[in-house]
A protein has these predicted regions:
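Phosphate/pyrophosphate-binding catalytic cores of soluble transferases and nucleic-acid-acting enzymes
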Residues: 1-272
């Protein structure tokens, strides 16, 4: 097994005071492969920290690759994948609650939990015990922001984060105007409704960062994108649109879903 040496090192490291193992890294770095083999080695269970893999039916574009969760014929238990319908606005607050339910259940069974994913904000919220509360929509604020450009919204968001001393930095906040407006809505709410106590305790974890040569990573990303397109990415998005999921919602999910949707609704060409 390619990761056996690292698995050996982790297994013999001092985990007596560690309640969890966290594996993180950029796209196409191999973190899922490491997590799966480590889980097999330790008889552990994986908790996903991916903001898009929570959605059912969004398989190719999110790179679920659920077949990879089988090692030597044994399926590694995984959690927080395929837990809600596309179009649902799954958020950080809900993830934190869902994570805690999974984590406590796994620990209660005296099994080692492994947190793995590429959504840094989800991982940070769990490890640091962010104090979160559900933020209601603010129709008046949304209306006031509706005509502003993404650049203008980015400036407003940066100012609010400064005022809030916010550490919740997430690049996807400024992927689109819709995301930026929601982020502004959250920061505006937090400015007026500060939470003084954490809603959950921080979790002590062994953190493993997976890295990869930049050129190799770029090659893998390009290869993976071509593979996804060849294996039905466009058809997957078309099916989601035909099922009633709005183009706006799919664009909200970013990355491949954004561009394939833009292609299907005629905003860009296939080559673009």
């Amino acid at each position: 097994m390619e990761n056996k040496g690292l698995c050996d090192q982790i297994a013999i490291s001092d985990m007596s005071e560690r309640r969890m193992i966290t594996i993180l890294g950029p796209t196409a770095s191999g973190k899922t492969d490491l997590a799966v083999h480590l889980a097999s080695y330790l008889k552990a269970e994986i908790i996903s920290a991916d903001s898009r893999q929570v959605y059912r039916g969004m398989d190719i574009g999110t790179g679920k690759d659920l077949g990879d969760y089988t090692v030597d014929g044994h399926v590694i238990p995984y959690h927080l994948i395929d837990i809600c319908e596309p179009g649902t606005k799954y958020n950080l607050f809900r993830y934190q609650q869902d994570f805690l339910d999974c984590y406590e259940n796994i620990r209660k069974r005296k099994v080692q939990p492994i947190l793995c994913g590429g959504t840094g904000l989800y991982i940070e919220a769990v490890l640091k015990g962010y104090s979160l509360s559900p933020v209601p929509q603010n129709p008046e604020l949304r209306m006031a922001l509706a005509d502003k450009s993404l650049e203008e919204l980015t400036v407003i968001l940066a100012d609010l984060k400064t005022k809030n001393h916010s550490v919740m930095h997430n690049k996807t906040d400024i992927d689109s105007c819709q995301r930026a407006i929601r982020a502004i809505e959250i920061e505006t709410y937090n400015l007026s409704n500060p939470v003084k106590e954490r809603s959950c305790p921080p979790i002590d974890s062994l953190i493993i960062g997976v890295n990869i040569d930049r050129e190799e990573r770029r090659r893998k990303i390009t290869s993976r994108l071509k593979s996804r397109l060849a294996n039905g990415m466009v058809e997957e998005v078309d099916g989601l649109l035909k099922s009633g999921i709005s183009a706006e919602d799919l664009i909200y999910y970013g990355l491949e879903y954004k561009y394939v949707t833009e292609f299907l609704i005629g905003n860009i060409t296939y080559d673009e």
